[in-house]
UniProtKB/Swiss-Prot annotation:
Family the UniProt entry places it in: Belongs to the glycosyltransferase 1 family. Plant sucrose synthase subfamily.
EC code(s) of this entry: 2.4.1.13
Name of the top EC class for this enzyme: transferase
Reaction(s) this enzyme catalyzes, per UniProt: an NDP-alpha-D-glucose + D-fructose = a ribonucleoside 5'-diphosphate + sucrose + H(+)
Protein name per its UniProtKB record: Sucrose synthase 1
Record keyword Iron-sulfur present: no
Residue ranges of the region described as GT-B glycosyltransferase: 277-754
Biotechnology annotation for this entry: A one-pot system for efficient enzymatic production of a wide range of glucosides couples the activities of two recombinant enzymes, UDP-glucose: curcumin glucosyltransferase from Catharanthus roseus (CaUGT2) and sucrose synthase from Arabidopsis thaliana (AtSUS1). UDP, a product inhibitor of UDP-glucosyltransferase, was removed from the system and used for regeneration of UDP-glucose by the second enzyme, AtSUS1. The productivity was increased several-fold and UDP-glucose initially added to the reaction mixture could be reduced to one-tenth of the normal level.
Activity across pH: Optimum pH is 6.0-7.0 for degradative reaction. Optimum pH is 7.0 for synthetic reaction. Optimum pH is 9.0-9.5 for synthetic reaction.
Function as written in the Swiss-Prot or TrEMBL entry: Sucrose-cleaving enzyme that provides UDP-glucose and fructose for various metabolic pathways.
Organism per entry: Arabidopsis thaliana (Mouse-ear cress)
Amino acid sequence: MANAERMITRVHSQRERLNETLVSERNEVLALLSRVEAKGKGILQQNQIIAEFEALPEQTRKKLEGGPFFDLLKSTQEAIVLPPWVALAVRPRPGVWEYLRVNLHALVVEELQPAEFLHFKEELVDGVKNGNFTLELDFEPFNASIPRPTLHKYIGNGVDFLNRHLSAKLFHDKESLLPLLKFLRLHSHQGKNLMLSEKIQNLNTLQHTLRKAEEYLAELKSETLYEEFEAKFEEIGLERGWGDNAERVLDMIRLLLDLLEAPDPCTLETFLGRVPMVFNVVILSPHGYFAQDNVLGYPDTGGQVVYILDQVRALEIEMLQRIKQQGLNIKPRILILTRLLPDAVGTTCGERLERVYDSEYCDILRVPFRTEKGIVRKWISRFEVWPYLETYTEDAAVELSKELNGKPDLIIGNYSDGNLVASLLAHKLGVTQCTIAHALEKTKYPDSDIYWKKLDDKYHFSCQFTADIFAMNHTDFIITSTFQEIAGSKETVGQYESHTAFTLPGLYRVVHGIDVFDPKFNIVSPGADMSIYFPYTEEKRRLTKFHSEIEELLYSDVENKEHLCVLKDKKKPILFTMARLDRVKNLSGLVEWYGKNTRLRELANLVVVGGDRRKESKDNEEKAEMKKMYDLIEEYKLNGQFRWISSQMDRVRNGELYRYICDTKGAFVQPALYEAFGLTVVEAMTCGLPTFATCKGGPAEIIVHGKSGFHIDPYHGDQAADTLADFFTKCKEDPSHWDEISKGGLQRIEEKYTWQIYSQRLLTLTGVYGFWKHVSNLDRLEARRYLEMFYALKYRPLAQAVPLAQDD
């Protein structure tokens, strides 16, 4: 109720501000809103609203600038125009939304609740339908018992808030400590108790036993191995799992005694992070071609594959270290669960089980898509996998049980399809679930919710957005690579934030889908594989054996399906980019910027690695981008200054390719219209290559502008090209400028973007959220039932309506 009252007060003050401005600057406000209304029925985005403001006469603008209406205008993310009404979605700060509606004829300002705003917005598509019942999806009532921070600093730092809440609320008296005892007594591995035996039945016995153990251990040398006092511990009711030597066991016992006596957030996190509870991990990534060789650059196969392969190696190292320090002799298992593709010639995608390189306990487990007619053999776009996933989940559960001889301890989903399957598996098996979106498609395709019917035949967004909402509400915790993924920035809406309130007209409206202040959100940034990506200055590690191949790729005069166009001046620095060839990655946009900018063309050559011209693409978007590339080469006469190389699948050689570009004193550019994180940005910076990257999304956080790289706006290509040209001009005048940016990038990576930091954080989060899942289990039952109904009554019919692929 308090939240609702706060929101009404907040909206009311915005309405009053607008009313006051209508009194004091009536003509000026009307001049702007009339321009907006004149655009006719439709949606205006923030940049279009600001453009209308800037088109006003200077005198009119000056009267409004700096006033409350101008602040409201800058915070308005979209305007819905249905003359004579203009509705505004106002976002004063990340995660906080207010809705207003102005009647330009009557000069009436109304405040709207989210459902009212969405209903108004739906009239753009369906017209006025006052009598029709529409399902409203609202998860807010289920969150009443779950703590919610209100401070901006806790967005993406949910575990800190949760630790404070748990230590304050769960441990305020003796009775409230019982969940911790029950949680510790749950832990076992293959029938063998860990930490506590059946002798410990209550809190008094636990505290008494811990004090006895503390006294005993204090007399031992710190390096005394657990085996030497194991029998003594078993006598008093303590089992393995506390540590591998006296020092670690004593430290762990004192942590628990402190928690039982006077809990604090840091002690709680440290203790839960060390509790032995993660031995088997399953990672979901069904779509695309998931393998270790010869797949990068295939449709739907890019950064996510690289991310997961690097992730599992780092997780294995951290798990092995923790298991050893816990005094256990358990072999962990990490399974990457993906789709088996029988016809993926030249790859291992048809093999059921494949060991991950440079690992002992990580495997790729492949399970095929199946229908009543049998196994589906052909590749299927990530937009068309929906009708297969429920059967896939059931088949996967059987295969996992065979491989693990039991249940996993943690299930991690990736992207929309992987997160849906992870949710279904976690629901079925009752285990902790982690969600990683990588990219939420709703933010990539503007207005893809309100106009979903136009796009559904091609993209099936009705399925995907439904799966996303289901998974993000089902999961125990969500990790993102950046703050922007969750809550955007002052100017831009976050990927998750865009799911707070939206509508799919005729299907359902989401009045409260996700709250960016939810403590399940945590920022855990990945790194680059340091064995592949390392600074160009480390001469002894450089893979010079690849240089002749790299020179052939970049500079040979031969034009074929591997490389198109030639570089005439081989002494110029290389402006380099590497990505999938799709609309959002915007490689064709970069080529156009370059083609238009004479100064940049004189200063540097452009090399683009993307798309596979060696074979005919099955992906419609890639085909369209390829045509665009061919047209641009002709339009701007790029041959001589530009090289287009087909996708390169050898990551090791790609690492040396980045370093070779460093040798030319070149730069890397990532021009995406939106990028959730930007793994190639991290890879390039890790090699010491000065990097320019989109300001739309994660790279804006990775790069500190002007120090460790540069931000570019993909929607202002001319400015981006000038920024690139300015850099190369400055480097020509002062070569130390290149070194300065290169070193700044390397320093930034060391501080924040390594897989070691990532894996430590992920396992600690699993401990904390595993405990939270245990203590809040009853409170979450209603939400689970609501999600089950939403899945069965909405998602399943949508998935069944997606056409099945026809094998040739």
